[in-house]
């Protein structure tokens, strides 16, 4: 059995919340000296030897603790204790501290107060039990008083009504008792203060203690709360005992209770909520970008680091860069301010298609024609037409279909004429595609693309009746306000006329005289080459239109482009025949590449 074990202990104390506070106990040396010197004698009310027992127990406890400290601190600790100016007496001890230390419920060096928070005028229970079956609560009377939890402790003053109301309920066997306590009639000045509920347990044979019981008597009764004291009193019972509750803090409402570990969340403003949402979206987009980048790397495709840039802006930037490079390396081409506009130029389409052809030389002709059609469709989608323009386009398409039915018969009769012209264009393309020096290769590719595109335009307009050629060409280039407009139209008509004349001669003479007018000839004084260089400079304005367009001009351009694309299949078949004929007669030619020829003949962009 543990020496000085508590006879009666508190098993449960009700509260709204429990807080832990560290407590600084008084110096042990002053307590021992006050006991040994007899400064505050301990006298029991009934003259029982409990006072001497308490004194002996306290001395034994405190002397043992003092010896441990003296071994650690030695002389330094003794000098420090001797220099103390204040001496504590037993009356200044906190009853809660004395109870926890004497009953060995806590150790002095790590003493902690467990503060119980209760609501004003709300009852809470304090449960007690006896650790010895010989003690029966039916033989005792319980009385409660209220003290301030301070050093030195003092009673809570009142005038008429006691601030503490209580009701005790004893169990059937008498080993347990529950005291329902309610604290009231305290002003707001006491809110936040801590109190102690002292439970006086007195035998029925002795009078009950008064409400203003001295602190010394309470401390004496706390010392008698031990099983050893009960055994020493046998066969006489213990007459007075005291049990001190845990410190109590009183609040007026439950909302005032500060819950430890649960912070109060401040209501977020609209700006904070919006910022949090944007951060979540940004984090989600970053994760998606990583997945997309991984997919690009798996398929060996270059990942665009600016995925939110619009495709239209990128196309415009590429077209402007290509037009600027074409002006610097054009080789005799004329550049004006319209090249910097957002309208796509022919050079950008030619360069893009040329790059595509170099990477796909082994593809079939059908796949390449499908890619060209898809590129034209993408360009058409980038232009926004109004409702009125769409109606005019439908009307033009209907006229185009009617016109195509008439020209299908004419195209069968003009099969021989187209073969000679396509052979000359094929020979020029083959000459341009021969190996040259690396410094001049880029310029020759651009010039060959320009020539091939112009030859395609000439071939397309050959199917237009002669009576309508001049009007259609004039309307198509009406947007160019240049001094060379009339000369451009005249040169265009002359070229068409020369092509028709050459086709007639080649059909009668078997194409023997076609070598003199070959565009791909490398003679020093070739008239066709000089005419091509002159015409190339004049036609540059035609393929670089201005940014401000007239709705009627767009319709005419659409009409002419649709008409040229409708006869694309017949032109390619005729060009293949002309290449086979031209291989037997021209002394400068090598075997042409049909895939490069069809790729270089680009359709006109629809503006």
UniProtKB/Swiss-Prot annotation:
Residues 334-363, 383-451, 568-582 have a biased composition (Low complexity). Transmembrane segments: none annotated. Residues 62-84, 334-451, 568-602 are annotated as: Disordered. GO terms for cellular component: nucleus. GO terms for biological process: regulation of DNA-templated transcription; sorocarp stalk morphogenesis. It comes from the Eukaryota. The lineage of its organism: Eukaryota, Amoebozoa, Evosea, Eumycetozoa, Dictyostelia. This is Developmental gene 1062 protein. InterPro entries: CudA-like. One of its GO terms (molecular function) is sequence-specific DNA binding. Residues 364-382 have a biased composition (Acidic residues).
